[in-house]
Amino acid sequence: MTNAISFNLNFQKFENSINISFPAGLHVIYGESGSGKSQFIYSLSGLKDEQESNFIFTNIVIPEFLQIVFQNPENQILSHTLESELAFASECQTIHPQELQEKLTLLQSDLPFIHDWDRHPETLSGGQMEMLNLVTAFSTNPQLVFIDDGLSFLNDDSKKNWVDWIRNKISRGNVVLWLTSDPTDLAFGDTKWELSLSDFRSLDTIPDLNRYRYRHPKGDLAIKFNDLLFSYSKSDYPVIDNWNCDINQARSIGLIGKNGKGKTTLSKLITGLILPEKGDIQIQLKKKVPRIATLDQFPERMLGADTLASLVSDLVINHKMNSRLVNKCINRLYKYQINWKIIKDQSALDIPWATLRLALIIILGHSEYDVLILDEPTFGLGWKQKMSLSLFFQEILVNKYLILISHDKVFVSDHCDYIYDIDAQIVTRNKTVLINEK
């Protein structure tokens, strides 16, 4: 059975109206941050979105049975255990208990990295949550699936494997519209498209991307650990198993590795948020313990119920930001196309993810912290936003230091003078990003 979809897309301000149809298959739609990818999905699927849109849909013909994989993987999770999360959709279909158990066993086989099904889903890494959400979305055999940047936490190998998995799931004539902020994802599509503020067009080729023109000075950051061991409770295997690292004179350190293999856990050990079972971590800046700030891969966790304005106020009150730098910080936000007046008093949940992430990075960049640990800082950023982030790093890495946790190997290799590959347990010196170094 084929479930083709069609609609008219009208860009009112630009008097541009387009008739679009998608046959069965995987269709990849690229758009910069802020181009309206989430609004595209919400409007086409009939969900309410209070934000003003540059376009409207008419003459919509889509299957009734559809699923959405959301950009923020936490937004899709409803249950308190992994097993109940996996079973939830099937339970809603009132499947016979024996059939449900058989289906649950089959679904679990798609997620072999999970050993304790009583864990809370939020204990997974961002990439692992995305894998879970893909499995739950496809578990009900939908005719149409929207993916809103839902593979952006995955490293290259995992992404290829899951695209193959998706293709296997839609081989009977289903439609998948995958909207992404990463233009390299276009290579996976049966058709390729680009969404902008004024147009929606088909692409024959993938746009050429310029490499980052980035350099920073040599640094004085040192980090060392030997035979580091850490396991989470009820886990059969250690997340960190006798890791070793010795880095000196760094300015920016990149941590790369497969999804769920301990990058975020290592950052928590570095900051002392958790303690190792064996070994210790020494981190020094000019032979002193540095002041460290961490931005979670889920940036809304940093704010909780607070606003960005209250965060800046708290930083000043607690002597973590010089009051004389507040206006400079706000001006920097405007420089990078972030309207402080609009977002400063909004809830974190009401601010677009890419905007919130960039805003927090810029605010921390003006704080008194010496080292910023940024967990997946490029997630959800389009190419232009990544270039802006690169420029900001170049501006602050005269006095600041970075530890970048990322699956984006290109971004890491173009911005880090040391790269720690946790899978291979290898540290690589990368002099190409250093000023006056060959």
Features from the language model and the residues they span:
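Conserved ABC ATPase "signature" region
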Residues: 99-116, 324-344
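Hydrophobic anchor residue at the start of the ABC signature
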Residues: 134, 360-361
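ABC ATPase C-loop
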Residues: 138, 364-365
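Q-loop/switch helix immediately C-terminal to the Walker
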Residues: 72-74, 78-94, 298, 304-328
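Walker B catalytic motif
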Residues: 120, 149-151, 155, 347, ...
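Helix-to-loop junction immediately C-terminal to a conserved catalytic motif
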Residues: 45, 271
